[in-house]
Swiss-Prot record:
Protein name: LOB domain-containing protein 27
PROSITE patterns: LOB
InterPro entries linked to this entry: LOB
Organism per entry: Arabidopsis thaliana
GO biological process, one term: microsporogenesis
Xref: Pfam families: LOB
């Protein structure tokens, strides 16, 4: 009888053990299938169906909730979510989780370190963009600068060629004038001034005295030749329009376009031009002869002084040599 009671008691204990194991397994399976959030597991409480933190803290990521709980706390997170709409809650929780994650990795700087790093990257990209734009501007301006330099060089070369051609033609004209018995424009009161090629384009002031010169047209200069301009009615228009300032009288021989073209007092103007030209040539010839005579006299005086000095030096040397020989 006692043995039967002992066996029955052992069976009851085993049955209780089996029931306890089954209950533990059941509770484990029930908790796993229900998907309790990491917040509820961390707080060791039952996860309700309307848990506000369940969508953002899954059960398999307990470290995520620990970081948020350490930085903000459960009550602070719940208060933040209660003030937001349903559409804003995911974005707010994303920022909270990110801040707690960065603070866990960088306890000193936190999100400020990430922000400064991003700002440095933006600044570096902007500086690189500025450098690229400056290089592009430099490369784009190089052909333009080269073209401007070539244009300036061509312009200076053209001016130099025009000046050399003008000087050469002026020398040819001077030689031809001397051959023809004409003189240059010499003024005793002023220095010898050569009339520039574009003098007809420059205005003559009222105080400046007009200088009479034997001029020639631009077309004749371009043809590298010279021929005295004919003072007739056909070429008078070109002479008056191109060399109006040379004769010093701008309002006297103006071309009249009011009545369909033509000249006013053509015969009188041509006659006056001829007389003025003859008088200018005669005065120039006289001045040239006077200058040449003056230069010749100066050269003769200089040669005479040099000869006298040379003779004086010879006499001095002879006397010195004669004295030395006498003493010896």
């Amino acid at each position: 009888m006692s043995n039967t009671k002992h066996i029955h008691k052992g069976l009851q204990e085993r049955l209780l053990d089996l029931l306890l194991i089954a209950l533990i397994v059941y509770m484990t399976l029930k908790g796993g299938t229900s998907g309790a959030c990491a917040a509820c597991k961390y707080q060791r409480r039952r996860c309700a169906a309307d848990c506000p933190l369940a969508p953002y803290f899954p059960a398999e990521q307990p470290k995520l909730f620990q970081n948020v709980h350490r930085l903000f706390g459960v009550r602070s997170i719940v208060k933040i979510l209660e003030k937001l709409d349903e559409t804003q809650k995911p974005e707010a929780m994303k920022s909270i989780i990110f801040q707690s994650y960065v603070r866990d990795r960088s306890p000193v700087h936190g999100c400020l370190g990430v922000t400064q790093q991003l700002q440095y990257m933006i600044w570096f990209a902007e500086e690189e963009l500025k450098a690229v734009n400056s290089q592009l501007q430099l490369y784009r301006s190089q052909p333009q600068n080269g073209q401007n330099q070539n244009q300036n060089h061509n312009h200076n070369q053209m001016i130099h060629e025009l000046g050399s051609d003008h000087n050469k033609q002026q020398e040819d004209v001077t030689s031809q004038q001397l051959d023809l018995g004409m003189g240059l424009n010499v003024n005793n009161n002023q220095s010898n001034v050569v009339t520039p090629f574009f003098s007809s384009l420059l205005p003559v002031s009222e105080t400046q005295q007009p200088q009479m010169s034997y001029t020639y047209s631009c077309s004749e200069v371009n043809n590298n030749g010279y021929s005295p301009p004919a003072y007739n009615t056909d070429s008078g228009k070109e002479i008056l329009t191109n060399n109006n300032n040379v004769w010093g009288d701008q309002n006297r021989f103006l071309y009249n376009n009011n009545n369909g073209g033509g000249y006013s007092n053509q015969n009188e103007s041509c006659h006056e031009m001829k007389s003025n030209g003859v008088m200018a040539i005669q005065s120039q010839l006289v001045n040239l002869q006077m200058v040449s005579n003056h230069q010749r006299v100066e050269e003769e005086e200089a040669d005479h002084e040099y000869d006298e000095l040379h003779q004086f030096l010879d006499i001095i040397d002879d006397r010195q040599s004669f004295g030395d020989s006498k003493e010896a």
